[in-house]
Amino acid sequence: MGVTKKPDLSDPVLRAKLAKGMGHNYYGEPAWPNDLLYIFPVVILGTIACTVGLAVLEPSMIGEPANPFATPLEILPEWYFFPVFQILRTVPNKLLGVLLMAAVPAGLLTVPFLENVNKFQNPFRRPVATTIFLIGTAVAIWLGIGAALPIDKSLTLGLS
């Protein structure tokens, strides 16, 4: 059962608009064939031409060649894995670290159900979800910054 709002044809303002032809697709330019055959291919081919042109005119180096016999002193993951890397690095029990990593998406899945009875969309009128979001963001930033530091300074961020 779909929820659609049917127009009120007894409304005189709507009837006047319909009498003028407004509210229907009787004005403007049709999408077929004008947009689909002429404008879209030009935009797509122009995007491809710009991408290929930039790749040919300004080839960027990938970086220094890899040396399989030299490993870096500390292997760091990509920046978006820093918070969970910090969890794995600081928790002594690795099983607990993996469970804490699995708790991150599980916790994110529970946030919408904490205030599902609240009908407001304004964050200031949803204090529980907003508080959880702000605390989670602060913890993720704290863990992310700590992952880039040596392990003895990672939890305090070198401030103490």
From Swiss-Prot:
Return the InterPro entries for the record.
Answer: Cyt_b/b6_C (IPR005798), Cyt_b/b6_C_sf (IPR036150), Cyt_b6/f_cplx_suIV (IPR005870), Cytochrome_b_C_euk/bac (IPR048260)
Where in or outside the cell is it found? Plastid, Chloroplast thylakoid membrane
List the GO biological process terms: mitochondrial electron transport, ubiquinol to cytochrome c; photosynthetic electron transport chain
Q: Does the keyword RNA-binding apply?
A: no
Membrane topology per record = Multi-pass membrane protein
Give the domain of life: Eukaryota
Chain coiled-coil ranges: none
Question: Which UniProt keyword terms apply here?
Answer: Chloroplast, Electron transport, Membrane, Photosynthesis, Plastid, Thylakoid, Transmembrane, Transmembrane helix, Transport
> Its principal location?
plastid
Q: List the GO cellular component terms.
A: chloroplast thylakoid membrane; mitochondrion
UniProt-recorded Gene Ontology molecular function terms: electron transporter, transferring electrons within cytochrome b6/f complex of photosystem II activity; electron transporter, transferring electrons within the cyclic electron transport pathway of photosynthesis activity; ubiquinol-cytochrome-c reductase activity
Q: Which cysteines are joined by disulfide bonds?
A: none
Q: Which residues cross the membrane?
A: 36-56, 95-115, 131-151
Family assignment? Belongs to the cytochrome b family. PetD subfamily.
Any idea what job this protein has? Component of the cytochrome b6-f complex, which mediates electron transfer between photosystem II (PSII) and photosystem I (PSI), cyclic electron flow around PSI, and state transitions.
Q: Which PANTHER family match?
A: CYTOCHROME B (PTHR19271), CYTOCHROME B_B6 C-TERMINAL REGION PROFILE DOMAIN-CONTAINING PROTEIN (PTHR19271:SF41)
Q: How does it assemble?
A: The 4 large subunits of the cytochrome b6-f complex are cytochrome b6, subunit IV (17 kDa polypeptide, petD), cytochrome f and the Rieske protein, while the 4 small subunits are petG, petL, petM and petN. The complex functions as a dimer.
Q: What is this protein called?
A: Cytochrome b6-f complex subunit 4
